[in-house]
């Protein structure tokens, strides 16, 4: 027989267990969204949406800029004698800010557990949030917006948000275009941004008809999540949409940003950088984490899924463009697969430095790259990729934390991007968190525990600039 006091004790324990279970379930529920779908039936008028989001814009941008300035030094400090392929100066120096009183050497000497326990992981090494993470979507640099508006009369400006990173940290614009089929010509862009209005004039006689049609499709705008004709858009006037080369300008990148479409809920989605299409022909994985196996798959995926945040329901409302695999997708990918890396005159046919052309610093940097730095474990010559994905387990260094409405929990497996032409495609890492090559060296020195000396770091940067 259970005594009253014992019964009371069991009741209390039972209630406590229920409360703990409920708390755990609530915590689990907080990690899930209420739904995987975006709202389709918008009852708010566009005029009201426009007024509300325009009024909120200054506060949103101010909060995000505070995050950027806390993470990194955004000043314009060009490197002497180091430029991209068409002459834009490279930014130099480590821009990620250290915790007060810390040095890079002291930090590198600590274990991941120590850094995590003492909250010493540099803010600039955390995942970088979207300029407005709860809203997300494509955001373009102003120079892309201005040139497309000038040439096509199409406006890529969002009324609710502007691009966040300063121009000096972005790729040169317009980017040069190199073709694997005509290496004798060098840059075939004539210094122009290729658009639907000038592609025929620039490429008729250089491409075959399939490639020319593929380029036309890559330059043709189609409706997208933020740029469409419905009331649920982020352009002031109804938009014809976005073209592939609005982000991949001239087959390279302009640094435009977005959120991955394959994660829910919203706060767990990762910011993504626009990657270059140079060297598509030697790559076997596409998408930073999706691991699509062909560029044909990715071209279809962009139109059907990524343009609409991975939501085919809302895509139906806004105007999804279904590409025909046997012709349109083939044409688009045939052009993408002849986009070449920029010239690297100091490299030999094996992708390594020619000692007769390289500086001593570059040669020392190559030794670090293939030795102590462990870089070549993943980035293998001649194109400096292994066409695999790797998980750096960055979550070893920090506790999960909310950063301006983005939940930072780690990165997961990420594609090994080619390093050929790396100097032409800042900022770095899949989400733009690293502004310079020096930042990148410090990041991997910490994550991989390689404990490079200051001179070794400088030499490694010199080598990567030569790739």
Regions found by a protein language model. Give the residues of each.
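N-terminal secretory signal peptides that target proteins for export/translocation
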Residues: 1-8
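Periplasmic c-type cytochrome electron-transfer domains
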Residues: 25-467
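Bacterial N-terminal signal peptides
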Residues: 12-22
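Residue-level detector of intrinsically disordered, flexible termini
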Residues: 7, 20, 24-26
């Amino acid at each position: 027989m259970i005594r009253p006091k014992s019964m009371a004790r069991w009741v209390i324990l039972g209630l406590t267990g229920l409360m703990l279970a409920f708390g755990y379930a609530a915590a689990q529920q907080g990690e899930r969204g209420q739904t995987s779908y975006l709202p389709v039936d918008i009852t708010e008028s566009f005029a009201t949406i426009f007024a509300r989001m325009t009024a909120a814009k200054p506060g949103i941008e101010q909060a995000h800029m505070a995050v950027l300035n806390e993470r990194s030094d955004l000043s314009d400090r060009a490197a002497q004698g180091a430029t991209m392929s068409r002459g834009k100066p490279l930014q130099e120096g480590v821009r990620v800010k250290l915790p007060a009183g810390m040095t890079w050497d002291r930090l590198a000497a600590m274990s991941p557990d120590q850094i995590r326990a003492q909250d010493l992981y540099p803010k600039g090494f955390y995942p970088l949030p979207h300029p407005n993470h709860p809203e997300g979507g494509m955001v373009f640099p102003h120079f892309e917006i201005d040139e497309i508006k000038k040439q096509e009369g199409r406006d890529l400006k969002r009324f609710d948000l502007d691009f966040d990173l300063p121009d000096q940290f972005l790729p040169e614009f317009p980017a040069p275009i190199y073709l694997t089929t005509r290496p004798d010509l060098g840059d075939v862009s004539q210094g122009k941004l290729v658009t639907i209005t000038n592609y025929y004039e620039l490429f008729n006689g250089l491409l075959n008809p399939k490639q020319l049609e593929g380029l036309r499709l890559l330059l043709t705008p189609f409706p997208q999540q933020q740029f469409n004709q419905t009331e649920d858009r982020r352009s002031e006037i109804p938009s014809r949409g976005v073209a592939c080369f609005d982000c991949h300008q001239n087959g390279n990148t302009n640094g435009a940003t977005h959120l991955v479409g394959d994660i829910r809920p919203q706060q767990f989605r990762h910011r993504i950088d626009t990657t270059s299409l140079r060297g598509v022909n030697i790559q076997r994985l596409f998408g930073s984490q999706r691991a699509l196996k062909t560029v044909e798959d990715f071209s279809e995926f962009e139109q059907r899924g990524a343009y609409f945040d991975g939501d085919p329901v809302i895509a139906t409302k806004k105007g999804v463009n279904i590409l025909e695999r046997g012709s349109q997708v083939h044409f688009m990918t045939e052009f993408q697969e002849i986009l070449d890396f920029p010239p690297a005159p100091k490299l030999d046919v094996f992708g390594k430095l020619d000692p007769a052309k390289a500086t001593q610093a570059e040669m020392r940097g190559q030794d670090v790259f293939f030795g102590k730095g462990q870089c070549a474990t993943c980035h293998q010559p001649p194109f400096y990729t292994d066409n695999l994905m790797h998980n750096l387990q960055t979550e070893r260094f920090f506790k999960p934390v909310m950063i301006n409405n983005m939940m930072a929990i780690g990165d997961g497996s990420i594609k090994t991007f080619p390093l050929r032409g790396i100097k032409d495609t800042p900022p770095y890492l899949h989400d733009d968190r690293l502004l310079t090559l020096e930042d990148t060296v410090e990041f991997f020195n910490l994550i991989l525990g390689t404990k490079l000396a200051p001179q070794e770091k400088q030499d490694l940067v010199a080598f990567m600039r030569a790739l």
